[in-house]
Amino acid sequence: DKGGVDRLDTSTGIDGKKGPINAPTVFNAAFNFVQFWDGRAADLADQAKGPPTNPVEMGSHSWDDIVARFEMDEEFKKEFLKEYPQVTKETLTHAIGEYEKTLITPNSDFDRYLKGDKTALTEQQVRGYELFKQHKCDTCHTGVAMGGQSYEYMGLYGDYFKDRGTPLTDADEGRFAQTKDPFDMHRFKVPTLRNVALTAPYFHDASAKELKDAVSAMLKYQSNVKQPTQKDVEDITSFLESLTGEFKGEKLK
């Protein structure tokens, strides 16, 4: 549950340490073209290599130590070797990545609507869907996961970071942190919108505490709607609530 996130501004790691950035949802991560906000991992197995030895997240000293611990667990090793030739960093992270591929949440109300059930959405949600398209939100939030297919600049139609009113952090660099290309400064992997009603707070910096706040900010900074109306925000928010899917046959909540 919880939409595949911890619902914290930044995640809590080992010994209560706080991470530097809002954690993306694990649900439907298999559909992302890269992993992490800055795209530093090419796929799920690559992503799984980072947290175990990160001093803030899990704090293991090395992958040699991690492998040795798993080797000591005879029951685990017996079962693991039924699928893999040996216990290594590569096989462990591959296994984690394969598990994450099962964390898919189909059968949202919007899915049913697209399949022809025109009763699946309320009138307000249909209005919100039309506004979503009108403001070209679907240009970036596209594909199976309605996002996760590109890097985009945060603040196309205004200085988001100046208006935020807090000092810049390393996390604000986005893709630039990996490429050092000035073009990539403040560019981030577009997040999925599936289950977005359950994944507050929003954005890499968790600056939007509620979904309606995120909608307002996106309209202002990404769609050039300087003063979005309350009705439009409410309609789009209602539409986004229709994107909550099911996991193991049960609706997420």
Each language-model region and where it sits:
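Periplasmic c-type cytochrome electron-transfer domains
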Residues: D1-K253
